[in-house]
């Protein structure tokens, strides 16, 4: 019998969301994504400590920032040995409001990959979907450096990313779901408010429809899933990046997966494009409490994990 994972792959490019690259082979994803939290989690496992220790040993006299960049490339390089497609490597979240330094970091990471013999067509540079991050992506894209816009929670962010020519966006399904569920409290009803009505699922569906309606080439990759239901409700989305735990659940399931999103069957098409000059962007983002709070929280969490990784590296010198 065909597994739910195999059925999903008929409609959507499946991406593995992990730094634990030893798990990749069993799920055969096309691409992989990493972030500071996933790398921090991976290097604390016995299987990956040798990569961390070797990177620190080889560059002991260099700055911690220098070592972290090499560690990211070491993980990305190993991941690319196991997948046919692309890996996403994230720019330090502490640069989320600094366009020039985000551009410099993106260029630097690509140079390191190319020095390791990996072409830029296999790399996506992850940037936070702040106004400053989007402007950095606009510059990098024109240089042939493809960008994955992360921490995306709203249509205005998605619209701005598309106008900037970003290669790909990662709307965060699960974190949107978390916010609305917390706000609802005891009134939340999973049967009524989940599934196709899940606010995270609806957000991605709205963004997907917007992009296809207006002919944007930016890829939509749903991310940050809590349940397999959220994933299967988005079957047909350009890409979905999924944690190993949920990939395993899909592989263990024989439930029928049907296509839910298609450029040929768009529903509730928008009438007009979103206004996305800087003032309009900032106002619309500010007007969306969920997106504002989750973007700020996401940057804080990734920045905190970057600091933890720095401390771990410094302890090994």
Curated annotation (Swiss-Prot):
CDD domains recorded: Transaldolase_TalAB (cd00957)
Protein name, UniProt field: Transaldolase
EC number: 2.2.1.2
Gene that specifies this protein: tal
Organism: Burkholderia lata (strain ATCC 17760 / DSM 23089 / LMG 22485 / NCIMB 9086 / R18194 / 383)
Pathway field: Carbohydrate degradation; pentose phosphate pathway; D-glyceraldehyde 3-phosphate and beta-D-fructose 6-phosphate from D-ribose 5-phosphate and D-xylulose 5-phosphate (non-oxidative stage): step 2/3
Chief place of localization: cytoplasm
GO molecular function, one term: transaldolase activity
PROSITE patterns: TRANSALDOLASE_1 (PS01054), TRANSALDOLASE_2 (PS00958)
Keywords, comma-separated and alphabetical: Cytoplasm, Pentose shunt, Schiff base, Transferase
Subcellular location: Cytoplasm
One Pfam family it belongs to: TAL_FSA
Top-level lineage group: Bacteria
GO annotation terms (biological process): carbohydrate metabolic process; pentose-phosphate shunt
């Amino acid at each position: 019998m065909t597994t739910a994972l195999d059925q999903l792959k008929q409609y959507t490019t499946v991406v593995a969301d992990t730094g634990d690259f030893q798990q990749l082979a069993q799920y055969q994803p096309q691409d992989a994504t990493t972030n500071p939290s996933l790398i921090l989690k991976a290097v604390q496992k016995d299987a990956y400590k040798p990569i961390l220790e070797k990177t620190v040993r080889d560059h002991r006299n260099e700055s911690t920032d220098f070592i972290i960049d090499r560690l990211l490339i070491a993980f990305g390089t190993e991941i690319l040995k196991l997948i046919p497609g692309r890996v996403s490597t994230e720019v330090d979240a502490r640069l989320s409001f600094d366009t020039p330094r985000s551009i410099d970091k993106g260029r630097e990471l690509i140079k390191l990959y190319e020095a390791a013999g990996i072409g830029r067509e296999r790399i996506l540079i992850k940037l936070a979907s702040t106004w400053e991050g989007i402007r950095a992506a606009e510059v990098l894209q024109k240089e042939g450096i493809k960008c994955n816009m992360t921490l995306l929670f709203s249509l205005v962010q998605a619209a701005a990313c598309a106008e900037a020519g970003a290669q790909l966006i990662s709307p965060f399904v699960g974190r949107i779901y978390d916010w609305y569920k917390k706000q609802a409290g005891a009134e939340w009803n999973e049967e009524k408010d989940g599934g196709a009505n899940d606010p995270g699922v609806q957000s991605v569906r709205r963004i997907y429809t917007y992009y296809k309606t207006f002919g944007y080439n930016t890829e939509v990759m749903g991310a940050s899933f809590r349940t397999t239901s959220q994933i299967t409700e988005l079957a047909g989305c350009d890409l979905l990046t999924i944690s190993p735990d949920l990939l395993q659940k899909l592989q263990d399931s024989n439930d029928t997966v049907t296509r839910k999103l298609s450029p040929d069957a768009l529903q509730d098409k928008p009438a007009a494009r979103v206004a996305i000059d800087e003032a309009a962007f900032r106002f619309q983002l500010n007007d969306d409490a969920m997106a504002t709070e989750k973007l700020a929280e996401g940057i804080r969490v990734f920045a905190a994990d970057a600091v933890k990784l720095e401390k771990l590296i410094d302890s090994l010198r």
